[in-house]
Amino acid sequence: MKYLVIAEKPSVARSISKVIGAYKHEDGYLEGGDCVVSWCLGHLAEYAAPEYYDERYKSWRFDDLPILPEEWKLLVSEDKKAHFNILRKLLRSKDFDYVVNACDAGREGEAIFRRVYGLAGSKLPVKRLWISSMEDTAIQQGFDSLKDGTEYDNLFAASECRAKADWLIGMNGTRAFTKKYGRRQTIGRVQTPTLAMLTERQNKIQNFVKEPYYKVEITGNGIVAESERMVQEQNADTVQAACDGQCAVVGSIERKWKEQSAPKLYDLTTLQREANRYYGFTASQTLKIVQELYEEKLVTYPRTDSQYITEDMQQTMTDLLNHYSGEVGKVEQVVNNKKVTDHHAILPTLESCKRELNNLSGDKEKIFALIVWKMQQAVQPPYIYEDVLVTVCCQDRKFTAKYKNILQAGHTAMPVPFAEQEKSKDVAFPKKLEQGAVIPVVSAEKKQGFTSPPKAFTEDTLLSAMETAGNKEFEKDTEKKGLGTPATRAAILEKLVSFGYV
C-alpha cells in the first residue's frame, strides 16, 4: 500500500523520511518505496479577514459590528500558495491508499493538517502519527501503531472553537475599541486580560504611597532580635531608651519541622519561567531553543502541560538518570498516569546519551542542562528543615529572632547549572541557646523602614499569573486552565511588546 505523510515543517519531514525510507528529493516532497513525505509551513490556511466576507468591511464602521460569519472562509497566504498547490495535488492523487497526519501531536498540529486536508478537498482515509520524541525509534514505533484520524475529531473541534473565538473577539473587539477611542487598539481573547493584569499591577505600583515604620533591634551574646513594627516613631524611641544597656531573657523557643518535596519535572511554562529567572531568557527565546533541541532529537516534545511521566516510561527515565548522574533516585515520585495529558513532561532523550553535546551553542547548552538538572532534582529526597522562633524579653517587651536549621538538604543540594548561586540569608540556631538564658547587657537600636509596593511582573511571574489566572473561581482542577496554553503564552507576551503596550 502506498501512503502520503504530511509533517508540520520541512525539518520534521526530513527526520521522518530517514526512518521510513523516503530519500529521493522532489519539488516540495521526498519519495521512496511506498511512501511520499511532504510538509506544511506552519499554519498554511487561516480564517479570512472580514473584508473577504463582504466588501463593505474594508472600512471600519461601528454600525457593522458585530461581524458574525455564517460560513467560515479559510485562506492561504500568497507566499505559501505554491506549496499548498503541491499538497493539494498530492492529497487529491489516486496513487495513495491513505494519508498520515504527522503534524505536531497537539491541538494546533491537528488544526494545521485538517485545514489543508479540507481545503484540498481530499477524500483519502486519515491515520494519525502521535509521538513525543523525534528519535528514530520513537518515529518507527509511532508508524507501527498509527491511530485512526477520527479519534482526534474532538481535538480538532477544540482547536476550531479556540480559533473562531479568537477571530470573533479579535476582529470585533479591535474594530470596536479603535472606533471608540480614535486610534488603533488591538483586542485579543488572551492578550487583553493579560494586559489587564499588567495594568492593574502597574496602577498599584504607581498609586502606592510608601509609609514609614519603625522597629527596635536588640543585640547581645550573639543574638539579634527585633520588635514588632511601630507606626509612631516616638514609641520606638521609648522602647529603645528603655532597653538599651539592660539585661534580657530568652522567653521561649518554638520549633517547627518542615518538609519540602522535590519539584516536579518541567512542562513548557515552568521551563520558560525558570529559564527567565536563571538566565534572563524570554519565553519566546526558550520556546525557540527547546523546539530546536526537540527537532535535533535531544529532548522530548516541548509544548506539554504535564510535569509527570507514565508508568511505561520508568525504565527510560532510569536509563537517563544512570547516564547523566549515576544515581537513579526515586523515579516513582514523578510517575502519575492520571496527570499526563497529551504528552509527558520534558525530558532528555535516550538519543542524547549517544551524542556529543559539547558542540551545543551556549543558549542551547543552558536549556539542555536545565532539563537534565530538573530530571535529576525531581527524584531527590525532600528538603527538610526546622524553623526556630526565639522570643526574647527585655523590660516587659517582646522581641523575636528567627533561625533555620537544615536537617536534610535533599533536592536543594543540586546547584542550578550555569547560574550564580544565591547566598542563603538563613541563620542557623545557636546550639547553646536555651530557654531562660540571661543576656546580661543588650544594645538597642531604632531602625526605620518603609512599606513596599507590589513588585512589577517579570516574565517568570507573569507566566505564573497567566497559568493560574481564575483558579480561585473554579473548584475542579479540570476547570483551572488559566490564560493561554504553554505553547501560546510566549507569543502573547511578544505581541504585547510589539504593539507597544508594555
Put a short name on every predicted segment:
Residues F281-T341, V502:
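Extended, well-ordered alpha-helical scaffold/bundle regions in very large, multi-domain proteins
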Residues Q333-N359:
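Acidic, turn-prone loop/beta-hairpin segments
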Residues C103-A105, R273, R303:
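Short glycine-centered, acidic/aromatic-flanked micro-motifs in structured strand/loop junctions
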Residues V216, G500-V502:
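Short, intrinsically disordered, charge-balanced linker/junction segments flanking boundaries
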Residues M1-A163, W167, G173, P453:
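Intrinsically disordered, low-complexity regulatory segments
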Residues V36, A45-S77, K89, Q185-Q291, ...:
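Long, highly charged, low-complexity internal segments
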Residues V12, G109-I112, A157, C161, ...:
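Hydrophobic (often cysteine-bearing) scaffold residues that line and stabilize catalytic clefts
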